Amino acid sequence: MSEPLMKVRNLKIGATVYPPGEKPHDIEIVHGVSFDLQPGKVLGLIGESGAGKSTIGLASMAYGRGGVKITGGEVWVNGRDILQSKLRDIRRLRGGEVTYVSQSAAASFNPAKKIMEQVIEAAVEQGKFSKKDAEARARVLFAKLGLPDPDNIGERYPHQVSGGQLQRCMTALALCPEPDLVVFDEPTTALDVTTQIEVLMAIKEAIRDTGVAALYITHDLAVVAQVSDDIMVLRHGNMVEYGPVDQIINAPQEEYTQALVSVRSITHEEKAPTPEPVLSVRNITARYKGTKFDVLHNVNVDLHPGQTLAVVGESGSGKSTLARVITGLLPPREGEIEFAGRTLSSDLAGRTREDLRELQMIYQMADVAMNPRQTVGTIIGRPLEFYFGMKGAEKRKRIIELLDEIELGESFMDRYPAELSGGQKQRVCIARALAAKPKMIICDEVTSALDPLVADGILKLLLELQKIENVAFLFITHDLATVRAISDNIAVMYQGRVQRYGGKTEVLSPPFDDYTDLLLSSVPEMRLGWLEEVIANRKMESAGN
């Protein structure tokens, strides 16, 4: 076997933490990790948030984010320990031998510069190519990555292309200097499932065609299985398991890896609807103030007590806009909302306190949905005071009951949001919504920002609470795995219209319309060769058309 391109030996990384009420102190966040990466191979780094994936990826460039420092070990790239290199050599390494693709291309590109100027910058600055040759290489990469109009797309500004196209432009930026290693840090996590598969296919083919080695960082085992040769499973800064993709997927040895492989094993039987729906959306057409174009077109859906209606579609399909109309934040241009046997005011200001109490919402980003200066007890207690006038011992008793229901317990009552994990924060938001004793809760992408295992726990909790409280859920998501796990009925939205609507079994069974078929076929499956099958099938379909 040839000499590894990269050798990591006993890597240790520390960070400074600032606990509330305590003095800042240093902790170790990566504990003696070792691995090899051969030229032209892809190593997938998998694990939940805080596992150390991105931290290890950045260490391959001798870099650490603010407050993070490499405290021990060796990182060898092309035969030299870069942790012992001089700063000028590290500068040549970054953007030359090793490049980086971040999760958010939109945050990485300069909005004031054209795409081409940014894609070729490192290649020219590193002396790899002249400006003319770098531009020619960039156009070749644009074509390889399946970007439209590859000869001219570089003349656009970042805001003039879609999110998926911009992510592929960032991949072109990373490949332009002809690096030996590319670090892909969650490059498809922020994308819709249909866009994700396009970017994943482009990355897979670009890696194969250029022969570059890669670290592919993600929390989605089904995704990493499609692009990697080997997988390293990380947890709390420790390596849990390391081996070929086939072994990790089909015969995992460690309990944590087995849990990752079996995630989303929830089974939810579709329930028969009750005679009267709790929510009826009738002929809703809406547009945003100051615009001339409708963003919702004649939308009709029903939601029954104790059931879950999943509203699914890509970004811009109208899912969250529908939620804004239902909650009164966006008055519709046409149509009406019937809720619990009455017609709701189209404007939030015209709704009664009872309307507000019975219709609650849980948001995607729990971080920004809670006051960081309030304790968990205060956050959950506010609806109890506002809607029911609870005080003192009565309120405290109910808060503890709600904390028990969300499986946190009384010990969390005096904690602040900063002291909670992502999953714990979302559980607190669920408890706050339940405190109002609603008939219906809108869940807007409530698991999309969470790791698979944490998200799995949240979904199981919601289903259990639904049985207890008989609350209806309008569940907005772009994740088809989530839809299969929890829904009774499904509305597939596309460009502001309901494309397909009905019971879960009906919607997820053929024959499909083209868009629903595209959505379903784009959900990564946890088996080897799935991506190659999708690529081959779509090329055949494209040739046939």
Residue ranges and their predicted role:
Residues 69-81, 335-346:
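Conserved ABC transporter NBD signature motif
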Residues 156-161, 165, 416-420, 424:
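Conserved ABC ATPase signature
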Residues 22, 69, 82-99, 125, ...:
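ABC ATPase NBD coupling module
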Residues 178, 437:
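Conserved catalytic motifs of ABC-family nucleotide-binding domains
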Residues 61, 65, 327:
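Helix-to-loop junction immediately C-terminal to a conserved catalytic motif
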Residues 133-152, 393-411, 520:
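Conserved ABC ATPase "signature" region
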